[in-house]
């Protein structure tokens, strides 16, 4: 609409300018005298022509524009321009002539006659008229050409404006159509937003309907598939029946109907009976399941009750163990005080101290600090002895020692101080417990090693006994000595125990700890082949006498070593769980000197002489009863594998029916 308004304003301005130009032209025509009629006529003619042209041009606005008139107008305009150029030149020439004539007239007026003047005036008048006419024609032509040119320009502008108006109108129509479409779309969108819940509800309903249809279709498919399977199974059954009937029809050796019916009746009765049995068994299974479930529930309840009872008992056991530990600590504290008092007593009496070697110090450090109660419990932890005689003597010695210590304790407890620091008590207790644990571990390792070695030796010698032929060798043992020697041995052992207790009180102020009697070394006899193998010689090589000499030499060494060890440990009261005898051989002299000095200080010089005289006899007397006890509990054809000090070449072999009990002879299988 804005473009149309602009076009209207432009058209109005154009027509206003044309009217002004026409007014100017009319004023110019009125001013020019004499030429008014000609100009009017020419204007009228031109107006008529222009009117016709304007009509033609207005008619052509709707259709197409005539470019031929423009061509003609251009040609006329060119001619008019040429005339415009020629006219001023002619005018200048005429002016010059007119001026020349005036000058000539002024100079020679007197000479010219009147007639000549009349003719000359007429010619001048005619020339002037002609000039004025030419000027009027030129002006009129010029005015007409300018008007035509302007009219044509205005027509062209009008045509352009009409084209623009048409384009703008079409654009407006298209824009109106688009606006209508947009308005419709916006209205639909707004309506859709308002109708969203309805649309969603419709969509959900459609989805539900489709799902129901799917389910129905799936159910139909399933039913159809089942029906197809059933029909297939029926077809197969019918085919089987047909085949069976065909075979029956083809068989010519069939029985009669009565027999077949009788068989069928029997089979049906059996089937019925089987069905009844199956039903009864199913009922029994159900009943049994119920009964078992009840029993399981009862048993679970019992187990829960037992678990609760066990938990309560465990709690009680823990409380009791704590109480026992507290009592043990109290007893240990009392023992610690007693040992301290003994130490103080010995210090006051100026008891002489004896220097000890490194071996003795190591043995004393290994000894644990135990209480009175632990002495009773650790009797069972001592490694098992090879004979009953050793066990009996060990138990007797322990009982005697415990009684002596129990007699000494009440005298010492009366002298204890009533107030002691708690820190010292607990430190002593922790130290004792640590030493006990260390000793138990050492003993357990020693026992395990001994057991392993004994088992290996058993296997080896059983194989050797199976492979080698038996040879009987008579070994003559010394006869038993008198009961006085046994009494001396016991007294000697008691005194050695007392001496060990005094040494412990002097060194560390703790309760003494002693093991049972010593293990005895076993003496074993081997064949020449085994002896040669032990010495690195071939089994068959070497004379028999050399083997016997080696055997006798080795047995003599073992006997001497055993006697020395028994003497030393009987005085010291300590027996290592595992080790070798080489250490004791090297330090034999120093140990004997210390032993003799201690015995002189404790019991006097006379006791040392008695012990020196009775030591070989005592050793023999102690060996004979122990060896005699070893032979009785073990059955024949069995060998005891326990040994002492890790000796790998020695095993005991039982005797076969001793020839006489008084002589003390034994026959040993090699």
Swiss-Prot record:
UniProt protein name: Lebercilin-like protein
Species name: Homo sapiens (Human)
Composition bias type Basic and acidic residues, residue spans: 560-572, 621-632
Record field: compositional bias (Polar residues): 38-51, 651-662
Statement: the UniProt record of this protein carries the keyword Aminoacyl-tRNA synthetase: no
Family: Belongs to the LCA5 family.
Region feature Disordered, mapped onto this chain: 30-51, 374-393, 495-516, 557-580, 609-670
Keyword Coiled coil belongs to the record: yes
A Gene Ontology cellular-component term: axoneme
Coiled-coil regions listed in the entry: 148-259, 305-336, 420-440
This protein's UniProt keywords: Coiled coil
A Pfam family recorded for this sequence: Lebercilin
């Amino acid at each position: 609409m804005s473009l149309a308004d602009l076009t209207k304003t432009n058209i109005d301005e154009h027509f206003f300018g044309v009217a002004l130009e026409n007014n100017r032209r009319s004023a110019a025509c009125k001013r020019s005298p004499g030429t008014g009629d000609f100009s009017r006529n020419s204007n009228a003619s031109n107006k008529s022509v222009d009117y016709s042209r304007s009509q033609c041009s207005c008619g052509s606005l709707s259709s197409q524009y005539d470019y031929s008139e423009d061509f003609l107008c251009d040609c006329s305009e060119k001619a008019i321009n040429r005339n415009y150029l020629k006219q001023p030149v002619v005018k200048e020439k005429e002016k010059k002539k007119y001026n020349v004539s005036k000058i000539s007239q002024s100079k020679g007026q007197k000479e010219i006659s009147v007639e000549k003047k009349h003719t000359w005036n007429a010619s001048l008048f005619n020339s002037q008229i002609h000039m004025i006419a030419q000027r009027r024609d030129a002006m009129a032509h010029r005015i007409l050409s300018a008007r035509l040119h302007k009219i044509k320009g205005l027509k062209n502008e009008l045509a352009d404006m009409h084209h623009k108006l048409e384009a703008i109108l079409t654009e407006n129509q298209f824009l109106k159509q688009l606006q209508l479409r947009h308005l419709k779309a916006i209205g639909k969108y707004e309506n859709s937003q308002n109708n969203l819940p309805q649309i969603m509800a419709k969509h959900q309903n459609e989805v539900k309907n489709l799902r129901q249809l799917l389910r129905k279709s799936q159910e139909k498919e399933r039913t159809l598939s089942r029906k197809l399977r059933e029909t297939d199974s029926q077809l197969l059954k019918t085919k089987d029946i047909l085949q069976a009937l065909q075979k029956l029809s083809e068989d010519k050796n069939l029985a009669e109907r009565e027999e077949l019916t009788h068989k069928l009746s029997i089979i049906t009765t059996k089937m019925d009976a089987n069905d009844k049995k199956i039903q009864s068994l199913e009922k029994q299974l159900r009943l049994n399941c119920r009964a078992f479930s009840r029993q399981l529930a009862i048993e679970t309840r019992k187990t829960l009750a037992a678990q609760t009872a066990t938990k309560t008992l465990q709690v009680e056991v823990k409380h009791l163990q704590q109480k026992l530990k507290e009592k043990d600590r109290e007893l240990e504290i009392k023992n610690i005080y007693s040992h301290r008092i003994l130490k103080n007593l010995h210090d006051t009496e100026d008891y002489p101290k004896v220097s000890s070697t490194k071996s003795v110090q190591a043995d004393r450090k290994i000894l644990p600090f135990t209480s009175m109660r632990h002495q009773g419990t650790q009797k069972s932890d001592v490694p098992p002895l090879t004979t009953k005689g050793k066990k009996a003597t060990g138990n007797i010695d322990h009982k005697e020692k415990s009684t002596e210590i129990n007699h000494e304790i009440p005298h010492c407890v009366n002298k204890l101080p009533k107030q002691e620091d708690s820190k010292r008590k607990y430190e002593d207790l922790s130290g004792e417990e640590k030493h006990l644990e260390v000793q138990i571990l050492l003993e357990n390792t020693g026992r395990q090693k001994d057991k392993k070695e004994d088992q290996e030796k058993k296997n080896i010698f059983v194989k050797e006994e199976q492979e080698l032929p038996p040879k009987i060798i008579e070994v003559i043992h010394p006869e038993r000595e008198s009961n006085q020697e046994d009494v001396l041995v016991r007294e000697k052992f008691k005194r050695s125990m007392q001496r060990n207790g005094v040494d412990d009180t002097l060194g560390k102020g703790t309760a003494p700890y002693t093991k049972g009697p010593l293990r005895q070394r076993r003496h074993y006899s081997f064949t020449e082949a085994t002896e040669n193998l032990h010495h690195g010689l071939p089994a068959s090589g070497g004379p028999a006498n050399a083997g016997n000499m080696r055997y006798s030499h080795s047995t003599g060494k073992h006997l001497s070593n055993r006697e020395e060890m028994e003497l030393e440990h009987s005085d010291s009261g300590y027996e290592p769980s595992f080790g070798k005898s080489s250490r004791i051989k090297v330090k034999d002299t120093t140990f004997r000197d210390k032993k003799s000095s201690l015995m002189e200080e404790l019991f006097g010089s006379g006791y040392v002489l008695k012990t020196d005289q009775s030591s070989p006899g005592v050793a023999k007397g102690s060996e004979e009863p122990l060896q005699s006890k070893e032979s009785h509990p073990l059955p024949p054809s069995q060998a005891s594998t326990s040994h002492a000090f890790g000796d790998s070449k020695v095993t005991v072999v039982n005797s076969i029916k001793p020839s006489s009990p008084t002589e003390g002879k034994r026959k040993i299988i090699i």
